[in-house]
Amino acid sequence: MVPERAVILAAGLGTRMGRKPKGLVRVAGREILYRTIRLLQENGVKKFIVVTNERYAPLYQEFIERHGFDAEIIINPEPEKGNGHSLHLAKEKVSGKFALTMSDHVYSRDFIERAVRGRGLIADREPRWVDIGEATKVQVKDEKVWKIGKRLKEWDAIDTGFFVLDDEIFKVTEILENEKNGDYSLSEVMERAKVSVTFVDGLGWTDVDTPEEIKRARRMLVRTAVKGTGDGFVSRHLNRRISTRVSELLVEKVTPNQMTVVTFLLGIISALTTLVSLPLAGILYQLSSILDGIDGELARAQLRTSKLGGYVDSILDRYVDGSFLALLAYATINEPIWYFVALLALLGSVMVSYSTERFRGAFCRDAYKEVPALRKLPGKRDERVFLTMLFLLYQIAASIKALFLTLAVLTNFRVALTLYFVVKKVSHPKTI
């Protein structure tokens, strides 16, 4: 069961960030706090309590009102004390189960989906995006926190800064308030309470304490924003390696819609170039295919995904592919029989995408997730575009005819297999 409330600790003075609230630092086009709240909302958390200091309270209040979040500010008048004290200040605002996280931690969507359904301290045994030397280590015994701290020489996992607790934790903070005069860390609370540990390994999360770490967080968000399920061989091994690096440079400057337009125009230019230079047209076509993944990467990294955006992008891709093959046929083919072959190639190219998109429309599910066999079939758009470029690099009539014949057979064979696998899947009453 997902907790309905979350406490976000944001009382630190952020001295290493130029005295700017770390929760309001923008990473990949969005404030860190916006990311945390938005992703928690998507997973069922409804109410948020932000514990901050007097200086930053007006800034956080304006942020909350601007975005319409159901959140409440609690002021910590003594932010120089440990963050355990900040947690204690929220005790009157939560009851039962609640999530706890830090305002300077950046999490990916898949991390939040797993973590919010965990229990106790969420730990990572395979951290990919943090500096191990600076991270808080955890020793685990009997599935509970045994020891915790940055200087542990022997440890089992890294503290991710995300917790799923209940109000029993405030009995421990009350004891530490009296023992430590309010100056104690969250780590002390977890070690004293011996909270449970849930492992969420190898997913995207990191903390942002310095300007340099913003770059690491940005890279993490872009790299974990790759869709993956519908990618073909060329995308996995070539296109994404390039597009993610470009996305890292653009994610703070360009919107997904702007990138969609740029990619579409480049695709149309590549089609027109078939009338001038086939090798150049092929190269531009492949370049447009590489860049075609950027709008989706930006949308997911910036939390700007929309059904409309995906719909428009899919339509424009069909126009690019249709224009390219039609103009290529016009520029290179003279015999009627090869016009027919080119027509089959064009129809097959359109139907490859239509067959999977129509599945989504009919069953409201991703065809590649529901029918995993489709992932292994050759003929996805990235593979067809790359193949087209290779054929066009050799300017002889036979290579163009071979291209159209290959595309005609490959695409229509793939559509036939897609139809077969879908019918087989749907015919089983428990599959859809």
From Swiss-Prot:
<keyword id="KW-0479">Metal-binding</keyword>
<feature type="region of interest" description="CDP-alcohol phosphatidyltransferases">
    <location>
        <begin position="226"/>
        <end position="426"/>
    </location>
</feature>
<keyword id="KW-0511">Multifunctional enzyme</keyword>
<keyword id="KW-0472">Membrane</keyword>
<feature type="transmembrane region" description="Helical">
    <location>
        <begin position="385"/>
        <end position="405"/>
    </location>
</feature>
<feature type="binding site">
    <location>
        <begin position="9"/>
        <end position="11"/>
    </location>
    <ligand>
        <name>CTP</name>
    </ligand>
</feature>
<feature type="binding site">
    <location>
        <position position="22"/>
    </location>
    <ligand>
        <name>CTP</name>
    </ligand>
</feature>
<dbReference type="InterPro" id="IPR053433">
    <property type="entry name" value="IPC_transferase/DIPP_synth"/>
</dbReference>
<dbReference type="InterPro" id="IPR048254">
    <property type="entry name" value="CDP_ALCOHOL_P_TRANSF_CS"/>
</dbReference>
<dbReference type="InterPro" id="IPR000462">
    <property type="entry name" value="CDP-OH_P_trans"/>
</dbReference>
<keyword id="KW-0460">Magnesium</keyword>
<keyword id="KW-0812">Transmembrane</keyword>
<dbReference type="Pfam" id="PF12804">
    <property type="entry name" value="NTP_transf_3"/>
</dbReference>
<dbReference type="InterPro" id="IPR025877">
    <property type="entry name" value="MobA-like_NTP_Trfase"/>
</dbReference>
<comment type="similarity">
    <text>In the N-terminal section; belongs to the MobA family.</text>
</comment>
<feature type="binding site">
    <location>
        <position position="113"/>
    </location>
    <ligand>
        <name>Mg(2+)</name>
    </ligand>
</feature>
<feature type="region of interest" description="MobA-like NTP transferase">
    <location>
        <begin position="3"/>
        <end position="225"/>
    </location>
</feature>
<feature type="transmembrane region" description="Helical">
    <location>
        <begin position="264"/>
        <end position="284"/>
    </location>
</feature>
<feature type="binding site">
    <location>
        <position position="113"/>
    </location>
    <ligand>
        <name>CTP</name>
    </ligand>
</feature>
<comment type="function">
    <text>Involved in biosynthesis of di-myo-inositol phosphate (DIP), a widespread organic solute in microorganisms adapted to hot environments. Catalyzes the condensation of CTP and L-myo-inositol-1-phosphate into CDP-L-myo-inositol, as well as the biosynthesis of di-myo-inositol-1,3'-phosphate-1'-phosphate (DIPP) from CDP-L-myo-inositol and L-myo-inositol-1-phosphate.</text>
</comment>
<dbReference type="GO" id="GO:0046872">
    <property type="term" value="F:metal ion binding"/>
</dbReference>
<dbReference type="GO" id="GO:0016779">
    <property type="term" value="F:nucleotidyltransferase activity"/>
</dbReference>
<keyword id="KW-1133">Transmembrane helix</keyword>
<dbReference type="InterPro" id="IPR029044">
    <property type="entry name" value="Nucleotide-diphossugar_trans"/>
</dbReference>
<dbReference type="GO" id="GO:0008654">
    <property type="term" value="P:phospholipid biosynthetic process"/>
</dbReference>
<feature type="transmembrane region" description="Helical">
    <location>
        <begin position="337"/>
        <end position="356"/>
    </location>
</feature>
<dbReference type="GO" id="GO:0016780">
    <property type="term" value="F:phosphotransferase activity, for other substituted phosphate groups"/>
</dbReference>
<keyword id="KW-0808">Transferase</keyword>
<dbReference type="Pfam" id="PF01066">
    <property type="entry name" value="CDP-OH_P_transf"/>
</dbReference>
<protein>
    <recommendedName>
        <fullName>Bifunctional IPC transferase and DIPP synthase</fullName>
        <ecNumber>2.7.7.74</ecNumber>
        <ecNumber>2.7.8.34</ecNumber>
    </recommendedName>
</protein>
<comment type="similarity">
    <text>In the C-terminal section; belongs to the CDP-alcohol phosphatidyltransferase class-I family.</text>
</comment>
<dbReference type="InterPro" id="IPR043130">
    <property type="entry name" value="CDP-OH_PTrfase_TM_dom"/>
</dbReference>
<dbReference type="GO" id="GO:0016020">
    <property type="term" value="C:membrane"/>
</dbReference>
